[in-house]
């Protein structure tokens, strides 16, 4: 079988679903490559994460589509989801990516995760995600601290030769002094990330920054995502975080 893969968003961030699809087809002996509109394929897959990404009008009508960008909440079949990712699709990616948990306990109106994945649940261990050729792991969990399994995996990585990044941000409401102590013992690729999406959560985020500081994590090692719905209110949050010494990004 001749298989074409289409990364609709083309953000240079590896698409985990496409990497697993590639790995599964290659394990069946199929030929897999990036989709070329000039060629004919037996099967074409297209993944789209973001709703603002334009749809490609040249994809064949029988393309198998997936992702929230298409308004679809479909999941990979179990036999494909179980595959280790095919990192050869993204040769510039030198780290592992994956999830320790799926789902979330929150129901933020701007987030599709609870509708798509349901409540929080265990998914993988860190050993299953780690690449043999890299010590760096980028976790994409939506709320890893809300799951006992997630906390157990964090504990298990302490003292190991791995560096981590929870790139979706940690839930500041779940960061206690004990959790801050646990997180501070990890080796981080660069930042500890959190989100500050509303005015109400700002004091909680500032408390978490202070707890990290007590454990030896300098504020500049904390990165905070800012959801901008009202520019003036978001600016006030950004200024407060700046004064606390944290890095930040509006989105």
Model-identified regions with their sequence ranges:
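Core AdoMet radical
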Residues: 10, 45-48, 112-208, 219-229, ...
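Catalytic cores of alpha/beta
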Residues: 228-245
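Short, charged, surface-exposed secondary-structure boundary motifs
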Residues: 42-44, 56, 72-79, 109, ...
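A short, structured N-terminal alpha-helical element that caps or precedes a catalytic domain
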Residues: 1-65, 71-72
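Canonical Radical SAM [4Fe-4S] cluster-binding loop centered on the CxxxCxxC motif
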Residues: 17, 92-128
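Ser/Thr/Gly-rich flexible loops in soluble cytosolic domains mediating phosphotransfer, phosphorylation
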Residues: 64-89
């Amino acid at each position: 079988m001749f298989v074409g893969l289409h990364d609709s968003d083309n953000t240079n961030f590896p698409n985990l679903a496409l990497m697993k699809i590639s790995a599964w087809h290659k394990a069946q002996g199929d030929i897999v490559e990036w989709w070329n509109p000039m060629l004919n394929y037996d099967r074409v897959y297209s993944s789209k994460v973001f709703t603002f990404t334009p749809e490609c009008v040249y994809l064949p009508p029988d393309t198998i589509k997936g992702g929230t960008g298409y308004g679809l909440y479909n999941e990979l079949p179990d036999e494909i989801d179980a595959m280790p990712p095919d990192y050869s699709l993204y040769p510039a990616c030198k780290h592992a990516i994956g999830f320790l948990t799926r789902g979330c306990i929150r129901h933020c109106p701007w987030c599709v995760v609870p509708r798509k994945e349901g409540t929080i649940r265990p998914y993988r261990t860190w050993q299953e995600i780690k690449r043999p050729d890299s010590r760096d792991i980028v976790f994409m969990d939506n709320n890893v601290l809300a799951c006992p399994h997630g906390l157990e995996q964090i504990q298990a990585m302490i003292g190991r030769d791995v560096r981590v990044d929870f790139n979706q941000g940690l839930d500041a409401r779940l960061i206690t002094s004990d959790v801050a102590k646990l997180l501070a013992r990890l080796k981080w690729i660069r930042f500890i990330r959190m989100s500050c999406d509303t005015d109400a959560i700002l004091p909680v985020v500032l408390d978490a920054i202070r707890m990290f500081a007590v454990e030896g994590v300098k504020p500049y090692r904390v990165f905070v995502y800012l959801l901008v719905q009202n520019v003036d209110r978001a600016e006030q949050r950004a200024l407060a975080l700046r004064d606390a010494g944290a890095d930040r990004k509006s989105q």
